[in-house]
């Protein structure tokens, strides 16, 4: 089993002054909404920028320390992890993946270019949006092709985590998507295989057949590597490293799950 690795690094601008609240047990919760744009070169050699909006959650003493100090438009660095949560509401099982901050720090914004979106929210150009994961596949890869013939694969990744002071391991179930040559390479993997993923965090939203709005946070892979366990697994083809133009939508804050649907 691959060792668990779960890291998120973000640099973006605060779209609004953060909200702080408390659980019934007195735990402070500070929610930060960050916005930025990822820049990369697509297959045709053209430079593209894709906007993103991510909600980051800070708990405990750090939440109380920063609660009154942060303002809309500030440039913020976040180091954290992806956290999978599952709960039940009205007899229906629900789940979400959120960014849990371990550390945040305001950055100097001088010389950094921001723009305003259609809702008047500041968004940082050439932001940082990086996720590094290592875990094991929970199912065989699902390879498909778009009508234009572009390969795309969906992967389920289980990342085990044991944090200091915790006796039991916790498993985070995360979704990964890869495109083109990287997708075709990943399609040869099988359930249980270890995988190192380096990519960017994106939010999907869609309307189900029943008319419900659905949300999913996933990782779009920019690089995949197969961990080896001894000489027997050291061979095999090396995965391509690609810069993908797979996401082409303006993912807005309206795509976040409503607060009443969250566990606290």
Swiss-Prot record:
Domain of life assignment: Bacteria
Name recorded for this polypeptide: Single-stranded DNA-binding protein
InterPro entries xref list: NA-bd_OB-fold, Primosome_PriB/ssb, ssDNA-bd
Compositional bias of kind Acidic residues: 248-264
GO BP term (any one): DNA repair
PROSITE patterns linked to this entry: SSB
GO molecular function, one term: single-stranded DNA binding
GO CC entries: nucleoid
């Amino acid at each position: 089993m691959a060792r668990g690795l779960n890291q998120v690094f973000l640099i973006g601008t605060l779209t609004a002054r953060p909200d702080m609240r408390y659980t019934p047990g007195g735990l402070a919760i500070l929610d930060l909404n960050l916005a930025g744009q990822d820049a990369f070169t697509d297959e045709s050699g053209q430079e593209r920028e894709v906007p993103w909006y991510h909600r980051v959650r800070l708990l405990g003493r750090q939440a109380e320390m920063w609660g009154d100090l942060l303002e809309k438009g500030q440039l913020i660095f976040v180091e954290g992890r992806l956290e999978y949560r599952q709960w039940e509401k009205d007899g229906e099982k629900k789940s979400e993946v959120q960014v849990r901050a371990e550390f945040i720090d305001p950055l100097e914004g001088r010389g950094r270019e921001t723009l305003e979106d259609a809702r008047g929210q500041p968004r940082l150009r050439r932001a940082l949006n990086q996720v590094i994961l290592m875990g094991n596949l929970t199912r065989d890869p699902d390879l498909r092709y778009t009508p234009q013939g572009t390969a795309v694969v969906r992967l389920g990744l289980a990342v085990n985590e044991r944090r200091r002071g915790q006796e039991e391991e916790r498993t985070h179930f995360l979704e990964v998507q890869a495109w083109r040559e990287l997708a075709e390479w990943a399609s040869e993997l099988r359930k249980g295989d270890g995988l190192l993923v380096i990519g960017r965090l994106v939010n999907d939203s869609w309307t189900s057949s029943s008319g419900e709005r659905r949300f999913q946070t996933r990782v779009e892979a920019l690089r995949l590597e197969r961990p080896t366990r001894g000489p027997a697994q050291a061979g095999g083809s090396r995965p391509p490293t690609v810069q993908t133009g797979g996401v082409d939508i303006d993912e807005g804050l309206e795509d976040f799950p409503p607060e009443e649907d969250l566990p606290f």
